[in-house]
A protein has these predicted regions:
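Short, positively charged patches
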Residues: 1-135, 139
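A short helix-loop-beta submotif of the ANL/AMP-binding
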Residues: 142
Length: 142
């Protein structure tokens, strides 16, 4: 089975930026091992009851749909086990379990980068400001 499915499953199971990703990887080593962990093994990892509940749904259906769509579009899924996954993210406690990209993949560790992060329920003004900031950064070569 394509190991990216387990990374996508993990990403979908936990909130963005969850510190549990790093803790789980420190304990289990790989997303597949997290997926295969029993409820008891997850509890012993001391990640909290909420995270254990989030990881109790072992369905890979959503992960399959996401991966198939990404591949249909000719896009990329990068996971911490991929050589192109940025080292700067790999060693973050709340590292993303999966990154999605389109086009030619540069060496992301060798170029300056900026992340624009915000709430999922941003105001209209917040969206405009984030768009303007991102457009300005892109126009400036970031």
């Amino acid at each position: 089975m394509d190991s990216r499915l387990y990374w996508i499953w993990l990403q979908q199971a936990l909130p963005a930026g969850s510190h549990a990703v790093g803790e789980l990887l420190d304990t289990f080593g790989h997303a597949r091992a997290v997926y295969e962990a029993t409820a008891e093994q997850l509890r012993k990892a001391e990640i909290g009851d909420d995270v254990c509940r989030m990881l109790s749904d072992k369905s890979l259906d959503t992960a399959y749909r996401i991966l198939n769509r990404v591949l249909e579009l000719g896009d990329w899924v990068l996971t911490p086990e991929d050589a192109l996954y940025p080292l700067s993210l790999r060693h973050m406690t709340g590292c993303p379990a999966a990154l999605y990209a389109r086009g030619v993949m540069p060496d992301l560790d060798s170029i300056p980068s900026v992340a624009v992060v915000g709430t999922r329920s941003a105001s209209r003004e917040g969206w405009r400001e984030a768009f303007a900031l991102s457009a300005g950064l892109a126009a400036g070569g970031m």
